[in-house]
Amino acid sequence: MTIQATLLAGADVFGTVEIKAKKCLLTYGTSPCTASLNDAQACFKTRNVLNDCQDIPNYNETNVSYFFCDEKNTEVIDGFRPLLKNVSIAPSKLPARGGLANVSKVKFTFIDEPDTDTDLDDNILDRSYIARENGTFWGKFKARNSFIQGQEIVYSVTFYQSNGTLSKLNQRYQIESISWPNKNGEVTITAKDPLNLTDALNAKCPPVSRIKLYSALAVGTNHLFLDSVVGIKSPDNLTIFRIGDELMEVDGSTYAPQPDGSIKLNFTANGRGILGTVHAVHEVGATVQEVARFDALSIDAALAKIFNSYTDVTSLQLDTSGWSAQVSAWRSSSFLTNYISEPTDIKTLISQICDQNQVMMWYDPQTSKIKLKAVAPELGTLKSYTDANDIFDLQVAEDDTLRLNSVSMYLNPRSWIGGNKPSDFQDVAVSLDTLYYDLYGSPKERNLYSRWISSTPVALSTTGVLINRFRASPFRISFKMPYDNFPQTRLITGDNFRLETRQFQNATGSSYVPEFICVSTKYDKDMTLNVEAVSYSYFGGNNGPIGATSFDGQDYSTYIAANPNAGGILAWISQADGTMLNGDDSYYIT
């Protein structure tokens, strides 16, 4: 429903809420609905605990929206209930070192009031009570919508831009819970982004097994019998199982139901005791755990497989084309392999992939998409701001907790059912800070244990990025800025940008303009943008592609011309004759 500009007279900002719920399309007692009670006892066309649908097989679901505006609104807006009291948003925040963002959480507070039910109950005229004298809106809403968790709630802010243009900002979340009215008649709806809903990230990969051995399994046997295959979610034809401490591979194409109700599957050639485990005898009734397998997948493909196969997050919420573009540009050498035999929280696995490959993942409530971006320099034109013209309330601090002087990544596990100690891995990749290691007085180290990365050069890329970014204590900043009318300069989470301020000076006292990564954004009620960011200090080089078709269309000549003071951001590869594209002598790494 559109808010008309005439309703905004005297107000600069106007907030509304839309709750999207489910409802049956059918008319009570009319075919195909077979419910047969009288209309006074008709259902409320929703699935609920207390007054459920009376003909569940024919329940025909559709979406229905409920609209709310501010309780203090003096204009009557058709279809909007003036029950909204307050909206409190805790935005998603990216880890400073890259990885999976923390939860974004929104609390909507509503007042409650009696309600006539005229637009909610199709059978209101047949009821034996007067709706306005019986209960309240939220009490009845909650009783009629028992299964509202996961449904979408949209917070919309309509406002005038500084140029007088009417604009609207929508932020979409998913409902986690609705409280019962408290003693003051207030109801709280808690909503979160889809990355962090209980059913999404507390799901397990692989799922906890419900499968048992139907008969004992001897050493050397080339097939096994299962009591069922219920709950297996592997999309792979060649499925790996774990029984006890043995991993084994079966050929899904040999699936054969037996007369006794069991399921027979054949092992692949040499399919027993694989991946660092050994053959063993297994008793009847032993648990057969599906293994989630990832065979040399790109970062975006591995993440997509986790979301699509093991969570209820929909494919429409995944910005997979954006993921692919980032991975192709910056992490194309990373191919991930893992065999997960213990049910593990989805959030843990996504965090591992993001952290160990230096990519960031977060939910954008304005596009309703889960975004991914590599921790990398911005090769295009950086957004740039100053405290003289663009921002206010700037706070600056150095965060020594982020400093790193040594990063080690242990990789290639000796066994895929082993632990996460250094001795459980075959290889280690180490990057050291040789510039400032002992100058701070207390060198800081970090160890990563990766069951995803199998390439030492890729591991060294991650450890190198971390050292190059955090060998010096980075800046953490926060500031505010007005709403930007122009999308091309509007700051959003994940953006790289530069900030010029009197607070940043070099040793000569001249202006120093560092680069930052925006880790969090939130709009206030008055559309003031609150920003948190961490400095992007990069002392090493990312390899820049050869030729004019490099990332963002820039070659060596145009990049150097546009960024004369950006030395160290890119390490450009010379031509075959040893010169750079503009004729300069090539660089030497010493």
Q: Predicted regions: what is each one?
A:
Residues 261, 270-278, 394:
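Periplasmic N-terminal soluble interaction domains immediately after the signal peptide in Gram-negative
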Residues 246-268, 353-355:
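Polar, enzyme-active/binding microenvironments
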Residues 175, 250, 518-520:
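Conserved hydrophobic positions within beta-strands
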Residues 1-2, 40-43, 48-137, 143-169, ...:
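C-terminal extracytoplasmic interaction modules
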Residues 1-40:
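Intrinsically disordered, low-structural-confidence terminal and linker regions
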Residues 282:
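Beta-strand/loop-dominated core regions that host nucleotide or nucleotide-derived cofactor-binding catalytic loops
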